[in-house]
Amino acid sequence: MPKQADYTWGAKKNLDTIACLPEDVKQFKDLLYAMYGFTATEEEPTSEVHPGAILKGTVVDISKDFVVVDVGLKSEGVIPMSEFIDSSEGLTVGAEVEVYLDQTEDDEGKVVLSREKATRQRQWEYILAHCEEGSIVKGQITRKVKGGLIVDIGMEAFLPGSQIDNKKIKNLDDYVGKVCEFKILKINVDRRNVVVSRRELLEAERISKKAELIEQITIGERRKGIVKNITDFGVFLDLDGIDGLLHITDMTWKRIRHPSEMVELNQELEVIILSVDKEKGRVALGLKQKEHNPWEDIEKKYPPGKRVRGKIVKLLPYGAFIEIEEGIEGLIHVSEMSWVKNIVDPNEVVNKGDEVEVVVLSIQKDEGKISLGLKQTKHNPWDNIEEKYPIGLRVTAEIKNLTNYGAFVELEPGIEGLIHISDMSWIKKVSHPSELFKKGNTVEAVILSVDKESKKITLGVKQLTPNPWDEIEVMFPVGSDISGVVTKITAFGAFVELQNGIEGLIHVSELSEKPFAKIEDVLSIGDKVSAKVIKLDPDHKKVSLSIKEFLVHGGDAGHDAEEESSDRD
């Protein structure tokens, strides 16, 4: 425990009372007198006195401005009256006083004495004898200096700016003249200075008071506090020496964006103690708990399926929050805004401030959540979609979008269907829908399937006409002769377009009996050729043709093709 110094600030100690000090201090005094040329018993100066010694002298004269003191040297010393200011009223001729020997003689041969330096010396000796680092002393703040304040604790001590207070300081001048207790932080013997702190005592007092208050606080009680800080997540209140946090979620039952919407600095609030952590010294406060909780009977008041009206108070990418009564908000998710449109942004349907009617979908009381639906207030066109668009129905629709895998068409506002790329042509291999369709055009198609649950409709264009491959064996029986136009030449053969757009392949081995280096030596794209059907594969939509077979069986056209080829050679 730091010792409490029995010291009165600002008083210039009567050095003559040194004999009343405790025994150990007397011994210390005797040592000092020996150092300064005094005898330990008589306390009289020795024959050899040096500057810096403290001497005992007698007042021989007093004037308005000066005091003349005889210390037993060859001349008397003249000391300014200002150095006796604290004891001038009791100062009389013949009184004994302690003085500091500045010089044994000046330029005029006179002794130079100082009462003030003697007083400071005795004060320093007293500090060394009675105080240590950690001691508590009382003092008065006398003036402002660079970096802090000066405190009179019987001698001047330095109070750094960081040690003045435990709160933010606006003006150092406000502290000048105050009488306070201070803790000695450092005593520098070599430099004869003392550093003190007021902040450490205030902080210790605060911690002690906080611990005491923590023990007194009970959960559920009401207390008044002053708003000392406002943050994004809540408000800190001073509860008469202890800080408590009023979280933004405990300020009101309704939604607020920032605590400053409800409170301001230095405002007094009555709050309820929600929780106390004595180990960490934390107190959680509540303001909304003083009012009725509108969520208590929420399930009875707003059962699922009930229609309610409310105001849009907030829009987020995933939905809109609607206030259905003060303190009660629900969410309309984007998926619950339209039966037929894929809503990406709530602004497509509603705006902040709109009054809307919604349907309660579900309630999560413990989490304070209500799910609402906007589309549920309107008829769902998918309810009777199967009756409206039966399979096999022919429809005309506008092409809304083309993708790599198909074309989307709008059957009615909000109801779209897909024509898959595989349902566009019986015979043509379509690489992209843009080969057949253009966005914005209308197209006739057949309903192929309706999935009510997944909200999907598929359509087909090729289904408008019979599948020619179903009649392929009748149209092109094996062994029959056909004619067509060469549309494509590959390394393995030539493709020929036949009747109804069906393609047949003349393999390279079936082109000619005569040897040739490459197919282009025999055929070119655009050539009209005759060939014989040698094989059909309806499942894989393949027709195999042969010019060789056609020629072997005496087909004139086949000969003409070879002759044309010979002419090119």
Curated annotation (Swiss-Prot):
Highest taxon of source: Bacteria
NADP is among the record's keywords: no
Alphabetized InterPro entries for the sequence: NA-bd_OB-fold, Ribos_protein_bS1-like, Ribosomal_bS1, Ribosomal_protein_S1-like, S1_domain
Entry GO MF terms: mRNA binding; structural constituent of ribosome
Entry keyword RNA-binding: yes
GO biological process: translation
Keywords, sorted A to Z: Repeat, Ribonucleoprotein, Ribosomal protein, RNA-binding
Any single GO CC term annotated in Swiss-Prot or TrEMBL for this entry: cytosolic small ribosomal subunit
Name of one Pfam family that matches: S1
Matching PROSITE patterns: S1
All copies of domain S1 motif, residue ranges: 52-116, 134-199, 220-288, 305-375, 392-462, 479-548
Entry similarity comment: Belongs to the bacterial ribosomal protein bS1 family.
Function, in words: Binds mRNA; thus facilitating recognition of the initiation point. It is needed to translate mRNA with a short Shine-Dalgarno (SD) purine-rich sequence.
Protein name per UniProt: Small ribosomal subunit protein bS1
